[in-house]
Every structure is written in C-alpha cells, then in structure tokens.
C-alpha cells in the first residue's frame, strides 16, 4: 500500500524532473505541473542521491463509511504531525501503563531511532554523518515538530543562519562564529 505509493510518487517526481514522459504522453497536463506553486524548475536535471526525491512522506489516511482506509492526501514537501503522536503516546503510556499492550496497539517508540538511521544513511559520510533538523525558526507552525524530533534523535536543531558552506561542504557555526 503506502510503500508502493511512495515508490510511485518518487517515480513521478523523477520523470517530471527529467524526461517528462508522463507529460509528453498527456497522462497529466503539463500546464498543471508547470504552474504548480511547489514545482521547482531549477531541480530539472538534478541527480538526487540514490535517485530518491523524498524519503519521508506524510500520507493522511481516512476511513470511509464502509470502514475502508483511503489516502486523503500525500505531503511530500514538509510532512508533519508525527511528533504530536509520539508525544501523546509517551504521555498516555506514563499515565496509563500497559493499556496499549493490552489492546494490541503497536509501539511507536522506535520511530526516531529509525528516522535518524535513515537520515544518516543518506549521507556520503555514513555512518559518521552529522544529522541536524533544519527549521525556519520558532515562529513556524511546525516548530514543535522540529524541536521534538531533534531532541528525540539527539541532534542539533538549526536555522539557515546557523549553517555555512566551506569548500563545497555544509558546516554548522560554532559559538565562535565558524
């Protein structure tokens, strides 16, 4: 289900930002893609690491009146919301120990460990990669998400101004400024 969906979304992005066969075949109107607010012309022809455009997707699921799950939307740009689930589960587990186990609810405690492993694996410096969570800042609506994930993964929470490029590598500023 969802794995195949993410694979299909990545295949779509790969095609749109390279040959554009899906547009040439008129499966999707080219104007619809090229006028979309999130379409980035400058990405056309860019070779992304491992050929994957998005590693983390937020698929919003709903259940219809027949009890069947359906995807309401896919958020590839900035998927958020998992931190609220994780924080809620931590709180509920402390308040009601054992209730999730008795109900057969699967654990989600491994999420941030797996997320960190995924992000680390994407670096050419893996397994010695430095992972950070990049945030627009504390006034962003997803700031709690960014701060929570950084804290849970044990990584730095940084803003754009905390980073600089040195000899083709992205570096994090220190308290001394560089």
Q: Where in the sequence are the language-model features?
A:
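Domain-scale recognition of functional cores that engage charged ligands
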Residues: 1-178
